[in-house]
């Protein structure tokens, strides 16, 4: 039996990932962590025999408790209400985005074992500082985000 943790599991990608894992949830222990509570999604997660924990990745004790013996962590948690351009940003918003991205991720890295697989997807936003529009960006392309996200 594998222990799988999904942070940010109530977001779009997290919900889709839970759907994929729903066929395996009777054989593996799957824990979904999110700081939000969306009744419909939480009920579906529970119907799939997954455990839902309402909590924040900034809570080091909570993350340690649920990630310390995980086999796989899908780290999807992050601030999604991000400014589109720098003029829409504030220091407080940038600081929260940074704190969740850096400290929250560090909490997970500190909690997991060396044998644990961690999957951390990204988005096109890391390429937003390019000089021109590019199609077919490759994985080894230099990133140059201009916003905190």
Show which residues each predicted segment covers:
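N-terminal Rossmann NAD(P)H-binding glycine-rich loop of SDR-like oxidoreductase domains
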Residues: 3-24
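NAD(P)H-binding glycine-rich loop region in Rossmannoid oxidoreductase-like domains
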Residues: 50, 57-100, 128
């Amino acid at each position: 039996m594998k222990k799988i943790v999904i942070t940010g599991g109530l977001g779009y990608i997290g919900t889709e990932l839970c759907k994929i894992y729903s066929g395996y949830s009777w054989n593996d222990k799957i824990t979904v962590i999110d700081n939000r509570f969306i009744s419909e999604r939480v009920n579906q997660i529970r119907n799939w025999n997954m455990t839902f924990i309402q909590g924040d990745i900034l809570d080091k004790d909570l993350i340690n408790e649920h990630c310390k013996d995980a086999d796989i962590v899908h780290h999807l948690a992050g601030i999604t209400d991000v400014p589109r351009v720098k003029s829409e940003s504030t220091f407080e918003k940038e600081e929260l985005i940074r704190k969740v991205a850096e400290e929250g991720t560090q909490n997970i890295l500190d909690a997991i074992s060396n044998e644990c697989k961690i999957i951390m997807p990204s988005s096109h936003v890391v390429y937003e500082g390019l000089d021109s529009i590019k199609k077919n960006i490759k994985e080894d392309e230099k990133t140059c985000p201009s916003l905190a996200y």
